[in-house]
């Protein structure tokens, strides 16, 4: 246990997580006391992971306030784990909870970045599905990078047996 505590106290970098999915279950239960799931030790591939996310996490998201709360829980979980540098992917699809406003999503992420700036070096990336239209990636990706809130682009999706 002493080694675990020592490792926990060391400063860390998390160079890739999916922001609204990265919160500790304990913090999640503080805000959503009816949550009745445990995170499995492993998933049955990408499809199994997506099934878990849709069934358990996405079910909590009904509004932009819920998305902001999940992102806030994610960043606080990182801070609690002594993460000093966080690169987190913010899925473009979350705009649907912000009345399809990319600007509103950018503003929400920017406010979290500012809120925690003295506690963590937070560098969000905008996440696009690999199946996104190239025009959308260029158009929205440029808006996000030029906002100076986002520092990169995360292109994600099933990678087995597919060209990148």
Regions found by a protein language model. Give the residues of each.
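Metal-cofactor-binding active-site regions of metalloenzymes
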Residues: 1-164
């Amino acid at each position: 246990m002493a080694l675990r505590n020592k490792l926990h106290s060391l400063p860390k970098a998390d160079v890739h997580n999916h922001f609204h999915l990265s919160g500790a279950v304990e913090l999640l239960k503080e805000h959503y006391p009816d949550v009745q799931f445990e995170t499995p030790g492993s998933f049955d591939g990408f499809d199994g992971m997506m099934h878990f996310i849709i069934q358990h996490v996405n079910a909590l998201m009904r509004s932009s306030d819920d998305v902001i709360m999940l992102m806030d829980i994610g960043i606080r979980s990182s801070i609690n784990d002594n993460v000093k540098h966080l690169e987190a992917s913010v899925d473009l699809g979350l705009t649907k909870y912000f009345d399809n406003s990319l600007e509103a999503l950018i503003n929400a992420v920017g406010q979290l970045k500012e809120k925690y700036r003295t506690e963590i070096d937070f560098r969000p990336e905008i996440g696009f599905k690999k199946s996104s239209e190239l025009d959308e990636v260029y158009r929205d990706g440029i808006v996000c990078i030029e906002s100076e809130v986002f520092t990169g682009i995360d292109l994600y999706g099933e990678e087995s047996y597919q060209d990148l």
